[in-house]
């Protein structure tokens, strides 16, 4: 056990974590050259394309160190994006150490800081590594100073390497052996193994990635999941070197995979503890929490007969992604569809893209919303995640909205722009810290302002230099109202929004004029109105297309012309009563593009 090292890599997007992992695998001979592809551990196409890591993967590598001993290095790959922070904390809790990989030309970014603090809170040893030192813009001294200023760990003499060209990779491996502690645990104690990740395989069912903390797990053992109390039998055990290698048993300190007869991902929850039925542990390992959806959106098939296909596709995605929640819902405007819950905006985009790419679906997505807590006058408390489900204004005592704490790292010259943006979004400044050339801003922001377009605006006001990390803080009361859009006198439920009273009139006007441009002209006038309750705050008209009925009258009497025009008017009036309006997909996306001021 003293020769085992469990570690993961913490890095911001694009700082070279997957490339470094590839180098480790190549250096330790985990795969031969013909099997090496770039980004071996990112197995989904979308992970490779966006260059992000979504699911955790592992590799168990045997490394012969300079002291002549062979060490087993278990690399647990972690996602770097805000939305997947729970997966990151699970990956980190399975390790004793973490490599903090920082791009030597770009320096420290917000997500690196957040994940690094998570690691320090979990008591994980953090080892700084500077990557990309072969770039002309690399400035290792400045970045070492930044790591010290911002994160507060000693970075002088941090290992320098370039994962792309392979310089210094061996030094990094030596550093892992030297700095990261060996796992502790008792092989003879009752079994406690934490589920770091789980995914669905078409042949064997659910594959769980586990880290054994105490005890030993063997083939054919009967095991129990402690949060769901489900019991099952061990069918296969083994490790990934990224290829899977079968083993007879896994002992305390080891990381590997476990396959049982479980078919549903919901039974093997990430962060849960596995123990033996025969000799169970008295209590589970700490840190398990149910994943909460933060952002909701409606997904509707463009063709209504694809509804069942969409349900199948969502169920298949859910097999691999337990944090995706969905339930059927009906909208008058869009027909049958699903209300889905996501971890964040990136998660929403990825699910949408996977549905379109892997399952060939054509989708309409409504504007993302967050969960509101509504206290009714009779004292009852309900959760509303869909604006069209908000009860009547008269019966509501207060509406509480979710507030997040955002940490923004930004170069000094863009601080003003970013602060202006946060104030526009109703943010409250909590803290501001100067660290070298960077400034760390902490703001409490309403979450529904963030899900709209905050991220894009943050990037554009700071020329792409600002980076953001956020976590949920609390629900707090706020002056919110529901804004309805009416087309031809009928409310379109899928276009309803919950907005703050201050920006309601402005939002209503903007939306109405946006809709006017997007709704195709019909043979009759269409009124597009924005309403708060029964009060109309904005109106736009989509002009009718009309035929020139006077074309055939050359000279002639005015009464003849009047008669034809009156006849046309009456016809248009009749059409307006029976006509209904098709609302195009682009109109639903218009909500996202409406600015606040």
From Swiss-Prot:
Taxonomic superkingdom: Bacteria
Record keyword Cell division present: no
Membrane topology, record value: Peripheral membrane protein
Keyword hit for S-adenosyl-L-methionine: no
Pfam families to which the protein is assigned, alphabetical: EFG_C, GTP_EFTU, GTP_EFTU_D2, LepA_C
Biological process according to GO: positive regulation of translation
EC number of the protein: 3.6.5.n1
Alphabetical keyword list: Cell inner membrane, Cell membrane, GTP-binding, Hydrolase, Membrane, Nucleotide-binding, Protein biosynthesis
Enzyme class per UniProt: hydrolase
Reactions mediated catalytically: GTP + H2O = GDP + phosphate + H(+)
Transmembrane regions listed in the UniProt entry: none
Major subcellular location class: membrane
Recorded GO MF terms: GTP binding; GTPase activity; guanosine tetraphosphate binding; ribosome binding; translation elongation factor activity
One annotated Gene Ontology cellular component of this protein: plasma membrane
Domain tr-type G as annotated: residue spans: 2-184
Subcellular location(s) per record: Cell inner membrane
Residues binding GTP, per UniProt: 14-19, 131-134
Biological function: Required for accurate and efficient protein synthesis under certain stress conditions. May act as a fidelity factor of the translation reaction, by catalyzing a one-codon backward translocation of tRNAs on improperly translocated ribosomes. Back-translocation proceeds from a post-translocation (POST) complex to a pre-translocation (PRE) complex, thus giving elongation factor G a second chance to translocate the tRNAs correctly. Binds to ribosomes in a GTP-dependent manner.
Family: Belongs to the TRAFAC class translation factor GTPase superfamily. Classic translation factor GTPase family. LepA subfamily.
Protein known as: Elongation factor 4
Source species: Neisseria meningitidis serogroup C (strain 053442)
Source lineage: Bacteria, Pseudomonadati, Pseudomonadota, Betaproteobacteria, Neisseriales
Protein encoded by which gene: lepA
